[in-house]
Amino acid sequence: MPAASELERRTKRSKSRNKISKPIANMLSVIAFSICISPIVYFLIRSIYYLVFHPLSDYPGPKLWAISRIPWNYVNLQGDLAWRIRDMHLHYNSSVIRIAPDELSYTSSTALKKIDGTPPPREFLKCLDGRGIAPAVVNRRRSIVTETPERHTILRRALQPAFSERALRDQEDFFRDHTDRLIAQLRKPQYGVTEQNILRWFALLSFDIMSDLAFGQPAGCLDLVDEPWLGVIGSRVKSIVWYQFAVYYRIEWILKWIMPKAAMEARKRHQALTLQKVQRRIEEERSGKREGKKRDFMSYILGNDKENLSNMDLFGMASAFIVAGSNTTTYTMTAFTFFVCRDSEVYAKVIAEVRDKFASDTDITMVAAGDLPYLKACIEETMRLSPPTPSALPRWVLEGGEEIDGKWVPGGVTVGVHNLAACHVPWNWHRPLEFIPERWLQTKEGEFTHDDRALHARFLMVDIMSLTCFLSSMAMNEMRLALAKLFWNFDISLSRNSGNWWITQKSYLVWEKKPLMVTIKPRH
């Protein structure tokens, strides 16, 4: 009996514990379930808000892009953002689309003027959180690209003397000397036998010119037919989107794992060399050693230094000059060669104009090359069909909001004009996907009357790294002279495998620099 009583007591205690533990277990299950499902519920509620109640909910665009920035980042990392946004504008048949929960893309010249041309105090500030230029600060310093509006104004004033009419005239010797060196190299027998990567030759030319203009000393790229830093710049193009991704999600520490070590070390070497050259150039100016030498950018900047720029300011500007200037001209001249050589009629018109006007190579000067209307039209059409910066450099709408293209946009929204999309949509251009230089020669009513040339003009005035307003005239001078001399001296044809060069290009804020193989034969 005592044993039976003990068994009964144990049974009762066990049942009592089970009664207590069951609610606890149920409660823990509910908590676990809530923890697991709460992110899903949060995502669904947030998605409904973005799609139905958000101020941008009535703008056209893909729904998945409207509820998350993940699609934007994924496509950007693939190098397809410029092409995809162009396709979305065409798909929705709209000049404005929503490309992220808080971002709009426009294609009109009026939007471009509003976003990039509104003066202070309502100026749209550059978006530096990873959607545009990233990172904003390197080694605890901002560049001219990412400076505050106040500091940017100071740097612009300091740059103005270097881009005066007199300064542009003085640049003729720089352009002519290096262009003649390019022609001399291409005339060597070894370069007429095999196919040549014309993009590399244009890169060597542009890098030499920009280095000479920035430091008063050429880099010697054309003489050596090599420049290791060019390869570094090319490899770093793809890293731009990773910088954007890391900065946006505040995980910059991840960059050391995804960036090639060789590229990071080469970048550091280049920065050290650039700083050394800037310091040498400043010392030359102060000691009077530049007396009688050609005037470069630093001659004008240091000779009119009312802003008391530091060595680091000059270093930042010199680096930006070289990267922005060489990128724009290298890509545009390569694309020009592709589009012109792809169309036999256009090619025939270009060489006829150049060769009929000049009896000899020495007759081709910067001024004379500016008097080639068809060549100029081909450059303009190249920059329209394949703009050097195909994506947008977005800006913030200030608190209180702004009206853009007749519709109110709330503060805190990111807005921008994606250049490739704006240049390819049929409401801006007639026959937009065709290379037609004649559209720039039309002076009367005709087929291309309604082309939005104001849009193209604005592109030349606003940022390609915040320097285009200064560099556009210089770049046009360089391109007209170099292309006139090239097509006067040589017969050029695309290689058999170059037909898809343009349409297969990736973009990482700027275009990927894919080789363009051509055959170059001297005329005589």
Swiss-Prot record:
Entry EC no(s): 1.-.-.-
GO cellular component assignments: membrane
Keywords (A to Z) from UniProt: Heme, Iron, Membrane, Metal-binding, Monooxygenase, Oxidoreductase, Transmembrane, Transmembrane helix
Swiss-Prot/TrEMBL cofactor(s): heme
Membrane as UniProt keyword: yes
Binding residues annotated for heme, in chain numbering: C469
Compartments, record wording: Membrane
Superkingdom of this protein's organism: Eukaryota
Enzyme class at the top of the EC tree: oxidoreductase
InterPro entries, per database record: Cyt_P450, Cyt_P450_E_grp-I, Cyt_P450_sf, Cytochrome_P450_monoxygenase
Pathway: Secondary metabolite biosynthesis
Membrane-spanning segments: 24-44
UniProt keyword S-adenosyl-L-methionine, yes or no: no
General function of this protein: Cytochrome P450 monooxygenase; part of the gene cluster that mediates the biosynthesis of alternapyrone derivatives. Alternapyrone is a decaketide with octa-methylation from methionine on every C2 unit except the third unit. All the domains in the polyketide synthase alt5 are apparently involved in alternapyrone synthesis, that is, the 8 CMeT, 7 KR, 7 DH, and 4 ER reactions in the 9 KS-mediated condensation steps required for alternapyrone synthesis.
Protein name: Cytochrome P450 monooxygenase alt1
Gene of this entry: alt1
